[in-house]
Amino acid sequence: SIGVKGRPDPFPAADRDRTRTDLTVDGTWDMGDRPEGKLTIIHADNPVVRDLINGRDEDQTPAGFDPDHATGDMGNAYAYGQCTWWAYTRRTQLGLPVGSRLGDGGMWADSAKALGYWVDDTPRQGDVIVFSPAQVNNAWGHVAIVEKVNGDGSIEISEANVNGQVGPFRRAIEAKQTHEYQYIHY
């Protein structure tokens, strides 16, 4: 049919003279290309956590993990120069959550779990590594930050209060030892 100004009508009327074909259930229906990528994004108020949970750590978080758990952050309440002071300072620099009153270094993993943090024995960049008192031969334990996970599984950490020196200092931990420690992710 002809529409306005002699152009073909974009919405022609149905042609009642044409033969119709009945629909069957054995056909296929193709909507074109299938979408690729993730269709569900996990929300997190902290943009760094949101990027990690939907990127690097996708499908690795524990069942029921709430990325918006209480952080316990009320500012750096740790004594200057202590390992806990550095861990708090560095996590804040990285934009990752950290509690203000997690206790001595050796207490951090349990304190963080109690607040809802994801804690396990697999290191990831930006994590707090927790050394128990027995692992460092003192009554307080120790904490540091995982700065890099190397291809061979070893890690590089930054830490403070090593041999009474403020720091921060860097050192490596061999791959065979990394799973002996607890790591606070976020």
Predicted regions, residues:
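Peptidoglycan cell-wall recognition and remodeling modules
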Residues: 62-186
